[in-house]
Amino acid sequence: MVKFKQTSEVLKIMGNIEQIRNIGITAHVDHGKTTLSDTLLSAAGLISEKIAGQALALDYLDVEQKRQMTVKAANASLYHEYKGKPYLINLIDTPGHVDFQSKTIRALRVIDGAIVVVDAVEGVMTQTEMYLRVALEERVRPVLFINKIDRLIKELRLSPTEIQQRLVQIVRDVNTLIATYADKEFQKAWLLDPMKGQVAFGSARDRWGLTIPLVQQKGIKFSDIVDVYTRGKEAVAELQKTAPLHEAILDMVVKHIPNPREAQRYRIPKIWHGDPNHEIVKYLMEADPNGPLVMLINDIRVDPHAGLVATGRIYSGTLRPGEEVWLVNARVPQRVLQVSLYMGPYRELADEITAGNIAAALGLEKARSGETVVSMKYKDTMTPFEKLKMITESVVTVAIEPKNPQQTTKLIDALYKLHLEDPSLIVKINEETGEYLLSGVGTLHIEIALTLLKDLYGLEVVTSPPVIVYRETIRDRSQVFEGKSPNKHNKFYISVTPLNEETLRLLSEGIIMEDMDARERAKILREQAGWDADEARRIMAIDENLNILIDMTTGVQYLREVKDTIIQGFRLAMREGPLAMEPVRGVKVVLHDAVIHEDPAHRGPAQIFPAVRNAIFAGFLTARPTILEPILKLDIRSPMEYIGNISSVITKKRGKLIEVQQMETTARVIAEIPVSESFDIADMLRNVTAGKAIWGQEFSRWAPVPENMLMDLIAKIRTRKGLKPEPPKPEDFLSP
């Protein structure tokens, strides 16, 4: 068993930061990420060579093996020797499918380099671009692997010259993205130069790979590779020996991806926005193993035997069992019970793991992904790492119940665990019907969650057909309305206004947040979104669906005592709007004045909540309310002759073509369609292009539903929720 020998060697190298690399593999779905990971794992001796490529060692969930796609981001530590020196490479495999983006984005936070895998036939696709963009925003340095060269030879029958032209084009496309999205100081430095060995090409399935320096060193020509495939299997096996894939890739990683200390010097200012003069900064910038512990959790797993396993990167200090640590976001102390490193799907115990490494900890039961863990000494002064920007939203929902009603408690527990592991799976209980609602990024996301319920927890469930999650908003400003509490002793005077596009952008990109410095926030809103100085200073709350509550009152007695209750009332009103009980988005709620009863017994939540809600809803219904629907962006590649057919499918689906680009042999269509029209789009595109189209999709934006469909849609949503079809009128919320 190589593995045991390896664990001891791996632990030895962990203490030497120059010999560590933290990398991820990102790509569009099906471009060959997991096959590449397997080859790397087999070379590092974690699974036998015979089954690498078929083993899909990192795809260790049954679901992943069956569907041939990665659902979770898995970790493994690899061992590689370069120029006689041993290196430890922490590898994170990430899903390529758009429905699992949140996992990929969380993985990008803890790595310093990304191997971008591109299929030589399909070229750069939507998810390639999207993940590369996020990687560059996180200051993760890319290198490139152009995969499936065998397809260029066997399927497209390209000549050696044409193969080279295709590779040059892909490198050019990736470099264009780097020049577009990288921070200014890295735009030139990070451009990929094949001559320096920053681009590898090969076949992950056939397990061979080369870089230009290796080609020159081994004296291999493109015509030799074409020749190998004409000679058959034995020649391919020979090529595996002459040009093993792991050698090309891992050499490229060691040479061109920075070690954790080098990377943290330029990544910390980007991902951690604490006080630059805080003494902890010097430890973070140097990844100092003797400094205080600072760890960022990027992944939570529920192990049936061990309980909650929190995996993350140690940015400073050393993680040891028995130590008490502080969770900055959860604001609780926890004791680390066990520390381990990953080897494929297995955790190997360690006495300690030092800065720069990826580690797994048991005992941090209250940790969630995105949590910052710090030594107790800094519990009051540590700023958490920046929140991760998620590109997608969970917009598809199913109602779910166990086939066997006695398993309800088991279902609640299982759903809670699934949400822990994947925070973009959202679980809610419908108070009216008692149903459990599960929301995900797309239908596939939900299907996989249901399969996991069955496979991991033995739960058979019944689900409703998928429904789309909408948002409610307004298009005009309302006048001020009075909301009275049921006992008539408290009154709130409130108006509502739509937030402008610039404010929504600042909120959705996480530039403006509820818990940031109020002066800095006011300055950004004034300068970038044209806010009035007074309003910008007086923000009381910002909720998760991008609504803002502002306090413009002066001298109202007892307001401070009920401030938290008012904020709760605002949040509740925004959670379910008046039109169809869907979440509200993009509304500024202004409190102008209030009358509050002096006796606390008469101003509890049961009085304040309805008063605040009624004033907001009355204003909302007079301000040209509407429903927003989620829109998908499609990126379709297809032979030129099918463009007409594709265009008519898009139009039929209430979509619109944004651009059509002609490429060498194919056309690229960028289009948008509503999520509600997308459930059968895959079959339709296949039918009209004789199966020759390939496409990717991502969440694009929220857009108002066409006016001629609005009332009908509101009635449908309300009926589905067991409400009467007509929405309420403003008068329904105004007390006489």
From Swiss-Prot:
Q: What does this protein do?
A: Catalyzes the GTP-dependent ribosomal translocation step during translation elongation. During this step, the ribosome changes from the pre-translocational (PRE) to the post-translocational (POST) state as the newly formed A-site-bound peptidyl-tRNA and P-site-bound deacylated tRNA move to the P and E sites, respectively. Catalyzes the coordinated movement of the two tRNA molecules, the mRNA and conformational changes in the ribosome.
Q: What is its main location?
A: cytoplasm
Matching InterPro entries, A to Z?
A: EFG_II (IPR041095), EFG_III/V (IPR035647), EFG_V-like (IPR000640), EFTu-like_2 (IPR004161), P-loop_NTPase (IPR027417), Ribosomal_Su5_D2-typ_SF (IPR020568), Ribsml_uS5_D2-typ_fold_subgr (IPR014721), Small_GTP-bd (IPR005225)
Record: residues binding GTP:
27-34, 93-97, 147-150
Recorded GO cellular component terms are: cytosol; ribonucleoprotein complex
Q: Which SUPFAM superfamilies match?
A: EF-G C-terminal domain-like, P-loop containing nucleoside triphosphate hydrolases, Ribosomal protein S5 domain 2-like, Translation proteins
Per the record, the similarity remark reads: Belongs to the TRAFAC class translation factor GTPase superfamily. Classic translation factor GTPase family. EF-G/EF-2 subfamily.
Which GO terms fall under molecular function for this chain's record?
GTP binding; GTPase activity; translation elongation factor activity
> What keywords were assigned to this record?
Cytoplasm, Elongation factor, GTP-binding, Nucleotide-binding, Protein biosynthesis
Where in the sequence is Diphthamide found? Answer: H602
NCBIfam families associated with the record: aEF-2 (TIGR00490), small_GTP (TIGR00231)
PROSITE patterns assigned to the protein according to its UniProt record, in alphabetical order:
G_TR_2 (PS51722)
What is this protein's name? Answer: Elongation factor 2
Where can this protein be found?
A: Cytoplasm
One Pfam family this chain carries? GTP_EFTU_D2
Has keyword Lyase? no
Domain tr-type G, first and last residues per copy? 18-261
Look up the signal peptide feature and give its range. Answer: none
